[in-house]
C-alpha cells in the first residue's frame, strides 16, 4: 500500500514524524514510510 500514497498523505505523515526528533532523523536515512511505521505503527490510509 505504501506505493499508493498521495503526496498529500505523505506530507501529513512527515508532519507527524517531524514532531519526534528520532522519527525525523530516521526519516532522513530510511524514508518516511519506514520511519512512520517504526514509531507510530501501520499507516492509517
Curated annotation (Swiss-Prot):
Ca(2+) 2 binds at residues 15, 18. The keyword Calcium applies. The modification 4-carboxyglutamate is found at residues 11, 15, 18. It is found in: Secreted. PANTHER family: OSTEOCALCIN (PTHR14235:SF0). The carboxylated form is one of the main organic components of the bone matrix, which constitutes 1-2% of the total bone protein. The carboxylated form binds strongly to apatite and calcium. Belongs to the osteocalcin/matrix Gla protein family. Gamma-carboxyglutamate residues are formed by vitamin K dependent carboxylation by GGCX. These residues are essential for the binding of calcium. GO terms for cellular component: extracellular region. It comes from the Eukaryota. Ca(2+) 3 binds at residues 18, 24. This is Osteocalcin 1. Ca(2+) 1 binds at residue 11. Residues 1-41 form the Gla domain. GO terms for biological process: biomineral tissue development; bone development; cellular response to insulin stimulus; glucose homeostasis; negative regulation of bone development; osteoblast differentiation; regulation of cellular response to insulin stimulus; response to vitamin K. GO terms for molecular function: calcium ion binding; hormone activity; hydroxyapatite binding; structural constituent of bone. It comes from Diplodus sargus.
Amino acid at each position: 500500500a505504501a506505493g499508493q500514497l498521495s503526496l498529500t498523505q505523505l506530507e501529513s505523515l512527515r508532519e507527524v514524524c517531524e514532531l519526534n526528533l528520532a522519527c525525523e532523523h530516521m526519516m532522513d536515512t530510511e524514508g518516511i514510510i519506514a520511519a512512520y511505521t517504526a514509531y507510530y505503527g501501520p499507516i492509517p490510509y
